[in-house]
Design a protein with these regions (language model features):
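FIC/Doc superfamily catalytic core
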Residues: 1-13, 17-22, 26-28, 34-320
Length: 320
């Protein structure tokens, strides 16, 4: 068998002698032998493939998807699932505590839950976890009527509502409804109004302010018999992830500001809702830092400061 020196192999492979020595020392060249202080390498030895550097997600969506698929516990995905499920359901009247929801998510069991907690609260909690996964997995998909109906179907499957003849799970409402004193879109007009809304969003600039406008208009249509608020907030999460807008969770203790902000928006006063959601963005950025994503947090903060300085309301970010 013919052998080559370190220098000859380096010239043949187009790399440095130091790299060849490293390959030899780490047993990455078959047949290489050290004799009297010199490496002898078979002339027909194959060049080792370079180890690929580990790549890290550069967007929030990438982080969430990586942690979800690898089932990492105690990270950003873990925190988001628990926080958004607790707050979004609590806004709608769920009696489960944050700790109880954490327990259900982490153990897939009920633990010690009082008899006064409605079964629907438990079912809708599990369903909400699935809906958040759906949003993360399909965030890049187009926002369509079929997609929105699927979110509603996931949320309401197996609930007491799903067994009512007049309640349409995964379909638009059959009966007219109201929200407080606000009239919503008549059932017969929902498809038309939703089509118009989604057509507008498709062509609109994907800014923070326009995203909130989408949310307000969706809630005013109120396309489903129940579950509109939770579906609407899931849409917010999806589109934030898709368009690299800093996500936010509407905290339950900001419920009053959130509802007042929705009302104000319809009358041309946008500050309250925007400030409420910006607060949620600030909390999310703190979470990025807490879980080791400082560079992404810095990028988000820089974009926000630039937007405020320029007098705009565009809150987008990307590491790319």
């Amino acid at each position: 068998m013919d052998f080559m020196t370190i220098e000859e192999v380096a010239a043949k492979w187009g790399i440095t002698p130091r790299q060849v020595r490293s390959y030899c020392a780490n047993n990455r060249i078959a047949g290489a032998a050290l004799e009297q202080g010199e490496w002898r390498i078979p002339a027909n030895a194959a060049k080792p493939e370079r180890k690929r550097r580990r790549t890290f997600p550069t967007t929030i969506l990438g982080i969430l998807e990586a942690e979800r698929s690898s089932r990492i516990s105690g990270g950003l995905y873990h925190r988001l699932q628990i926080d958004i499920t607790y707050n979004s359901n609590h806004i709608e009247g769920s009696r489960l505590t944050h700790e109880q929801i954490r327990w259900i998510f982490e153990t897939k069991t009920l633990g010690e839950i009082g008899a006064d907690v409605p079964v629907d609260d438990i079912v809708e909690t599990a369903n909400h976890f699935r809906a958040v996964d759906k949003v993360i997995i399909t965030a890049s998909s187009a926002l369509t009527e079929a997609y929105i109906k699927r979110l509603h179907e996931i949320l309401k499957s197996g609930t007491s509502d799903s067994r009512k003849d007049w309640f349409a799970v995964g379909e638009y409402k059959r009966l007219d409804n109201v929200v407080g004193e606000m009239e919503t879109c008549p059932a017969k007009d929902v498809h038309r109004e939703m089509a118009k809304l989604l057509a507008w969003w498709k062509s609109a600039d994907k800014t923070f302010e326009n995203l909130l406008d989408l949310h307000v208009r969706f809630e005013q249509i109120h396309p489903f018999q129940d579950g509109n608020g939770r579906v609407g907030r899931l849409i917010l999460l999806k589109e934030c992830l898709k368009y690299n807008i800093t996500p936010f969770v509407i905290a339950e203790n900001f419920k009053q500001f959130y509802y007042l902000g929705l009302q104000d928006w319809r009358h041309g006063r946008r500050a309250r809702l925007m400030d409420t959601c910006r607060t949620g963005q600030d909390v999310f950025i703190l979470g990025l830092r807490q879980f080791g994503h400082a560079k992404l947090a810095e990028k988000a903060e820089a974009v926000q400061k630039t937007s405020e300085r320029q007098g705009t309301r565009i809150y987008t970010l990307s590491m790319v």
